Amino acid sequence: MTPRDRRRFDEQLDWVMARMPPLVHELIEKVPLHVEDYPSDAVMDEMGLQYIDELCGLYTGIPIGDKSVTHSGVMPDVVTIYREGILSTAADRRGEINLDRLRDEIRITILHELAHHHGLTEEDLDRLGYG
């Protein structure tokens, strides 16, 4: 990923976050948002991925409904979004990035991963249009 691509992505992420409802900002205070270029080798192996642009985001943690006192001392919940995956999803056949589509993909990915924090499954998200 070039510094220009990273900068362009981050500018659009800032644009999207500035327009998210206050509730989303409150959630991100509790479940931090990390931004990486692509998933680590460990994440790719664990998820059975072959290409770095296959994954747009990942929720790591224990969903709210599954938490109990026995989960004290575990790593904190985190939402990670991956620039390469989101840029790939927002690109047309020629590899050109449509800014509106990029913004939509960033927003959808963040909301999708926050929904996992609240216990929604991939099937639930598909039904809601956030799959």
Which functions belong to the PLM regions below?
Residues 109, 113-117:
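Catalytic glutamate of the conserved HExxH
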Residues 1-105, 117, 121-124:
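Active-site rim/adjacent substrate-binding subdomains
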Residues 123-131:
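Short, highly charged C-terminal tails/helix-capping segments
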